[in-house]
Amino acid sequence: MNPVIKKFQFGQSTVTLETGRIARQASGAVLVTVDDDVTVLVTVVGAKTADPSKGFFPLSVHYQEKTYAAGKIPGGFFKREGRPSEKETLTSRLIDRPIRPLFPEGFMNEVQVVCTVVSTSKKTDPDIAAMIGTSAALAISGIPFDGPIGAARVAFHESTGYLLNPTYEQQKASSLDMVVAGTSEAVLMVESEAKELTEDQMLGAVLFAHDEFQVVINAVKELAAEAAKPTWTWAPQPEATALLGAIRSEFGAAISDAYTITVKADRYARLGELKDQVVAKLSGEEGQPSSSEVKAAFGEIEYRTVRENIVNGKPRIDGRDTRTVRPLNIEVGVLPKTHGSALFTRGETQALVVATLGTARDAQLLDTLEGEKKDPFMLHYNFPPFSVGECGRMGGAGRREIGHGRLARRSISAMLPAADVFPYTIRVVSEITESNGSSSMASVCGASLALMDAGVPMKAPVAGIAMGLVKEGQKFAILTDILGDEDHLGDMDFKVAGTAKGVTALQMDIKIKGITEEIMEIALGQALEARLNILGQMNQIIGQSRTELSENAPTMIAMKIDTDKIRDVIGKGGATIRAICEETKASIDIEDDGSIKIFGETKEAAEAARQRVLGITAEAEIGKIYVGKVERIVDFGAFVNILPGKDGLVHISMLSDARVEKVTDILKEGQEVEVLVLDVDNRGRIKLSIKDVAAAKASGV
């Protein structure tokens, strides 16, 4: 086919969509160029047949940043790109979330999306270009997909309001970093980080983005009109009406009763028994459905039962109404040898969160397309299988763990002190020890508590809450503090974190169409009510950061020296600073402007290192008495070391009031003596006296 190109204006940028020139064997391939800043190649491939062995839709999204895109060669021994970075993993999830609900229910053909950043000027984030390219590639692929989608990034300034698709430079001054994706009718996904914005400001940003990315959707539709492949002939399996009716009539009441059991393990055990009974009764014989079909139908009845109960105003699975937060149990300082710790329990969800303080050298080094960066704040989230009572894989963090950790990090980071106020590297680890819904928000609460327990001067405590939605026709119910089952069976996952003053993070994933502005507004208001409730209970345990750091944390001393003294502190080949660190057991970081940070395991170690640095950088003061060591004797006097690296001359005439024939009659090398600084000339040479010390002491020097 001949290449097809569509250009359109998107905010302050010109976007070009091109297909038919590159990657022509893929089901759909689009090259997206934003001005001359970013070029992303997006390909989509769909398997022609479904894999019946998989009980889920096998969609995978792979976003990858090639170092050649920024004119770089990868570091390391192998000199090629390795495992996905955290940024690549997070962007892959960002693209996956809005497209997954738009594939038809029951579609089980494998679909793979690959987004490759092939060129960047390092001025803007390529993620929006990748999302636009994904929408376009799916639209022309012929794969069943209820798109297209649009996407946009939004910044916010108090003076200028909302800004569409800011550059990295513009983002620095913004109090909001939000990505929104959706169709022409509805918002499907929101991911954001903010500096205590109000609920109205956050909702305004979502609606602003939705309005602005309509131009993207229209451009993709125009591209598809010219370049789309024929739509696949696919139809869903007909609903097993008779089977569903049989299960509901005989087991519906028992299933409904099972969902009144408030303890998760007991409820699951009872539902497991019922499922076994249904399978035994309705499958296995000739002419009956297969066991997998019966299990799927049983799951559908569960889904409908829970949703009907909720929208009809009945109590939720654990007996709560729609606005109640589960009971909280909060403890801090639970681990004696850590720097800060908290155990946050909300119902059957529990997080053990630990804060650790380190030196500037402990910061995470990030090798990005924009260059190397150091990140002094890390928040890691771990979700072991025992937290849900299962056996499972143990190993490195998966995509979900990386995503949840980043959400918790976004929630907390705006409330951390500036580096010049608190120059420690901070690592927070959230260990999910029990899970029944909203473990990421438990991590936010636990992280805030652990940081305050560690003595990190937080600007304000932070709490998070997960909201849910069940919508049937015109009826809907918004649920506060959702359980795991409510998350799975509901239509929306809506997580809000913030302080008493405003929102610091908002994440939203919507599975259906028709989520109105009114519903989002109600959900944000209900989330605020819950957040303030949780913050009130947290503040009863620890309302502000401890005034002193844990005795287990390293001591940090900040000081500044003249820039011309930096070489003296470092020494030849780093010998001086290395000796100080080895002898005092402290670590020292020196900046080009002369700023020095000294970290010691103990206060004594840090202070010893500080004194050594002061000794090296101090200048000899005229009229001051020093205790020095005789370094070298010559015919005309003796050289005495009074400060590290600083020797002065005691002339033979300055040794004594009496006549001295030989210097060695008075002094010997290695001897400690008191000397008075008489003068320092413009070349830095120091003139000393021994004979004038007594008179100087008498005069009060």
Curated annotation (Swiss-Prot):
It catalyses: RNA(n+1) + phosphate = RNA(n) + a ribonucleoside 5'-diphosphate. Keywords: Cytoplasm, Magnesium, Metal-binding, Nucleotidyltransferase, RNA-binding, Transferase. Signal peptide: none annotated. Pfam families: KH_1, PNPase, RNase_PH, RNase_PH_C, S1. GO terms for cellular component: cytosol. Its EC number is 2.7.7.8. Mg(2+) binds at D487, D493. Residues 623-691 form the S1 motif domain. It is found in: Cytoplasm. InterPro entries: ExoRNase_PH_dom1, ExoRNase_PH_dom2, ExoRNase_PH_dom2_sf, KH_dom, KH_dom_type_1, KH_dom_type_1_sf, NA-bd_OB-fold, PNPase. It comes from the Bacteria. Component of the RNA degradosome, which is a multiprotein complex involved in RNA processing and mRNA degradation. This is Polyribonucleotide nucleotidyltransferase. The gene is pnp.
